[in-house]
């Protein structure tokens, strides 16, 4: 969060974990208000809250509940190998790390979203004649997982859609033009995230502009 923004809470609570947690609570609530009725889902990055201990965990739980009250689908971004540990937060889906085996898919009632392609250097590794991440994506999709793919290139999106034609895709920071191959003719099959929205000076306006831009590429029927 912006230092000036956090300072307002430090002035109220002192330089304490409570100040950091309350800043996150206010920031998150503002973003949920902006998203309500305009976006289908929100992604809450668990680490940003849990780094502030029990108070941060409390804020995370409150934001999950608040998002559900606004009829938003909640994805808890943990990139975890043990998703059942986070079931108590009540999120609808959780990101999991698939490279430790299929045990990461034991997510209880949450949808496991396997983070098969990240921004790390390991994405260039090969498995036979194709990228390792595509091989992992295929295995995860066969077991019913959705797939998180971090890319800005339509070729990557085409590749994963070809290998996993029925998998639901979570595309991280991919613009509408490059994300287009992920969607079917009805505009279904994928969800795109836009991390820039959380830093917007006017979140409500930024959300409206983002929705307008996406509708140029994808129309949900």
Report the location of each language-model feature:
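C-terminal helical cap(s) of enzyme catalytic domains, especially alpha/beta-barrels
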Residues: 181-221
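A C-terminal functional module that forms or caps the active site or interfaces directly
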Residues: 25, 147, 152-197
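Conserved anion-binding
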Residues: 3-6, 10-11, 15, 82-148
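Short, well-ordered coil/turn segments that N-cap beta-strands
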Residues: 37-41, 70-72, 90-92, 110-112, ...
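Short, acidic/polar
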Residues: 20-35, 82-86, 133-134, 178-180
């Amino acid at each position: 969060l912006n230092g000036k923004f956090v300072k307002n809470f430090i002035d109220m609570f002192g330089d304490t974990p409570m100040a950091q947690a309350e800043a996150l609570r206010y920031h998150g609530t503002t973003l949920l208000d902006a998203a309500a009725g305009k976006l289908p889902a929100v992604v809450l990055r668990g680490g940003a809250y849990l780094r502030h201990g029990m108070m941060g965990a409390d804020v995370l739980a409150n934001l999950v509940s608040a998002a559900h009250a606004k009829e938003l689908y909640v994805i808890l971004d943990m990139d975890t190998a043990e998703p059942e540990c986070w079931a108590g937060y009540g999120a609808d889906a959780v990101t999991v790390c698939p490279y430790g085996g299929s045990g990461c898919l034991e997510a209880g009632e949450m949808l496991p979203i396997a983070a098969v392609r990240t921004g790390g250097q390991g994405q260039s590794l090969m498995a036979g004649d194709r990228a390792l991440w595509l091989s992992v994506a295929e295995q995860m999709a066969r077991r019913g997982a959705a797939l998180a793919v971090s890319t800005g290139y339509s070729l990557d999106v085409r590749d994963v859609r070809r290998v996993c034609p029925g998998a639901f895709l979570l595309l991280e920071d991919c613009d509408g033009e490059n994300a287009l191959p992920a969607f079917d003719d009805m505009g279904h099959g994928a969800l795109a995230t836009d991390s820039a929205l959380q830093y917007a000076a006017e979140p409500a306006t930024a959300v409206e502009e983002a929705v307008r831009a996406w509708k140029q590429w994808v129309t949900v029927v």
